[in-house]
Amino acid sequence: MGIAYVDSSALLKLVVSEGETAALEADLATRDGLVTSSIAVVECHRAARRAGDRRILQRTELVLESVYLLGLTAVVLERASTLRPVGIRSLDAIHLASALSVDERDMEVITYDDRMADAARANGLRVQQPGRTARRA
């Protein structure tokens, strides 16, 4: 089914089971590959450490090993600094610029962060939220 760009909100659902986890796992099993920005390493590790559970940290490592990490290049950082909408948060802008750097026509962004999803769509990317039935306000 092509590759998917998965942001930290999606990756963390693979670490700690939530309502969308089963649907997300089923979707990802059909993908040819998964990519994310290397900033996801920091985001996921910080979340795991906040949880204070060694098993969560170990699961975080396993999840991150299953994803190809895109480096933070000068081109990605420059693009992130100029992306619209201007209100997009900095880490989301880096995720978005990283996704836009992938030369894969059929790639979809998987995120459970509605602001990130809106920004991705505004920049021409297709967004999926497996297991999410209704948009949260």
Regions found by a protein language model. Give the residues of each.
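Short active-site oxyanion
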Residues: 1-2, 31-34, 65-68, 103-108
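Short, well-structured N-terminal submotif of metal-dependent ribonuclease cores
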Residues: 1-36, 49-59, 124-125, 131, ...
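Buried hydrophobic packing segments
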Residues: 11, 44-48, 98-99
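A generic structural signal for short hydrophobic patches within well-formed alpha-helices
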Residues: 11-12, 41, 116-117
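Active-site-proximal, substrate-binding regions of enzyme catalytic domains
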Residues: 21, 38-82
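Active-site neighborhoods of divalent-metal-dependent phosphate/nucleic-acid chemistry enzymes
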Residues: 68-118, 123-125
